A protein has these predicted regions:
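Acidic, low-complexity proline/glycine-rich segments
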Residues: 47-64, 138-159, 191, 196
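Active-site-proximal, well-structured secondary-structure segments within enzyme catalytic domains
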Residues: 57, 61-62, 90-93, 100, ...
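Catalytic nucleotidyl-transfer cores of nucleotide-processing enzymes
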Residues: 122-123, 129, 142-153, 157, ...
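A conserved hydrophobic secondary-structure block that centers on an alpha-helix together
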Residues: 73-87, 167-189, 193-206, 220
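Short, charge-rich amphipathic alpha-helices with coiled-coil/heptad character
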Residues: 5-16, 150-171, 210
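Membrane-interfacial loop-to-helix junctions in multi-pass inner-membrane proteins
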Residues: 22-23, 179, 222-225
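N-terminal helix-rich structural modules
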Residues: 1-121
């Protein structure tokens, strides 16, 4: 639980100093979970629960726990076991580095624009990017979606689209020092080696062990069938959108013209929904649903947190 808190904080209030301390915990946590996963007495004890009279939910938990042990290398011995632990530790470090690079690349890009550049924006969209007397664009997802949806300036849409999709790579305009290519290659190699240690052909086979599908081929077949069924409709809708726009469309045009077409057909804008979903009503509805589903009470309380926008919720059982 403590690791989940640390991981969350590292993502939402990232700083070099916090991340430096967070990275020091990764090998410790990785080794902790590796030791549990390789604990044969614990594994055998849980396997013994198969002979106990359990309900369906309990049987499922036992089954998933046993599978978790087996995917954690509990059956490995000697050097193979040690290598598996080393791979797990290195993967935890590389995964953090990957996320860190994406985050820093995202935060590195900013562009000051004028009000004339933002034709098509409403008051709410302008407020998100107003900084003193300037308007500052960035690659955070709310700003990105607003620009793709409402900005009439096509060249500006193209610029931010290319900046967004090329983050943490060796192309585009974000700093090359955040390029994730080497990190991804190392992750791929280690995942392949990890799968081979467990007697699997590749990491895809490892990944599907804990999913509903039985094999990577089932995933491929599903996706190919999905393409076959959806592609004709996708082409039809693209043709309709291009006919409406009056010219061939690029990726940075799709959200913009989709919104325009929706406004024309339905006389409706996405922002028209906002008055019907005030913040207080949305939270009340969310709390009511959660309380009903899980038999708990939720109460917002005044408590110091890591950011002024964070709300602290007290959770109690109805029992």
């Amino acid at each position: 639980r403590e690791m989940s808190v640390n991981s969350h904080l590292n993502a939402v209030i990232f700083s070099e100093s916090f991340n430096e301390q967070y990275e020091k915990t990764l090998p410790i946590i990785s080794n902790y979970y590796s030791e549990i996963g390789a604990n044969k007495p614990l594994y055998m004890a849980i396997k013994g629960l198969n002979n106990v009279n359990l309900n369906n939910q309990q049987k499922h938990i036992v089954k998933e726990t046993i599978r978790g042990f087996e995917l954690s290398g509990v059956g490995l011995e000697g050097k193979a076991s040690e290598r598996y632990k080393a791979i797990q530790e290195q993967l935890s470090i590389l995964s953090n580095q990957f996320s860190k690079n994406v985050l820093q690349a995202t935060n590195s890009w900013k562009k000051i624009v004028s009000l004339d550049d933002l034709k098509g924006y409403g008051k709410d969209e302008l407020l998100k990017i107003k900084d003193s007397e300037k308007y500052v664009l960035n690659l955070q997802i709310p700003v990105y979606i607003d620009l793709m949806t409402y900005a009439e300036n096509r060249s500006l849409r193209e610029e931010i689209y290319l900046a967004y999709i090329s983050r943490a790579s060796d192309v585009g305009i974000t700093p090359k020092k955040f390029d994730n290519q080497t990190v991804m290659n190392e992750i791929l190699e280690l995942r392949f080696e990890m799968a081979k240690l467990l007697g699997l052909s590749n990491y895809a086979e490892y990944s599907v062990q804990s999913k509903m599908v039985e094999s990577p081929q089932m995933v491929i077949d599903f996706l190919e069938n999905l393409i076959k069924l959806s592609l004709p409709q996708a082409k039809k809708e693209l043709n309709e959108l291009e006919a409406f726009a009056g010219h061939p469309l690029k990726p940075w045009d799709l959200m913009f013209y989709s919104e325009k077409l929706k406004q024309k057909i339905f006389d409706f804008k996405s922002s028209d929904l906002k008055p019907f979903f005030p913040e207080k009503s949305v939270f009340n509805g969310l709390f009511s649903t959660i309380e009903s589903l899980y038999g708990i009470n939720l109460e917002e309380i005044s408590e110091e947190s890591y950011h002024p926008d964070v709300r602290v919720i007290k959770i109690e059982s109805k029992d």
